[in-house]
């Protein structure tokens, strides 16, 4: 995942993190020995822009096609600081995965109280 400035006259990268993947399968810092299948598929940004929530399952049939040995389930949080100009950091303490989801695949993040960007239309600013 990459973060770029929002200045169209002067775009530049201000942050980058890697998790999972088809070939690299980059591990989460909380479990460095555990190669992650899948990559961030569903992305939700907190309403204040300081947290990015990502999950790894897109659609079951596609997951099975691209990851025949299994995609598993994982959910990660990436922190950013818009006031400081950006930058991305994987939250090392937040990493539900595998058995935390009782065999289910994790697809989309829906947070009560409207913390995610897709909930913005439900709550007054």
Q: Where in the sequence are the language-model features?
A:
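Feature marking well-ordered beta-strand scaffolds used for ligand recognition
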Residues: 1-125
């Amino acid at each position: 995942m990459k973060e770029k400035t929002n200045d169209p006259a002067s775009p530049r990268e201000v942050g980058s993190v890697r998790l999972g993947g088809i070939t690299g399968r980059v591990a989460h810092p909380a479990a460095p020995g555990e190669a992650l299948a899948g990559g961030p598929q569903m992305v939700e940004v907190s309403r204040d822009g300081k947290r990015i929530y990502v999950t790894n399952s897109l659609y079951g049939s596609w997951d099975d096609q691209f990851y025949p040995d299994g995609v598993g389930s994982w959910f990660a949080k990436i922190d950013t600081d818009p006031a400081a100009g950006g930058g991305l950091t994987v939250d090392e303490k937040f990493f539900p995965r595998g058995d935390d989801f009782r065999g289910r695949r994790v697809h989309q993040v829906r947070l009560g109280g409207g913390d995610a960007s897709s909930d913005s239309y439900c709550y007054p600013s």
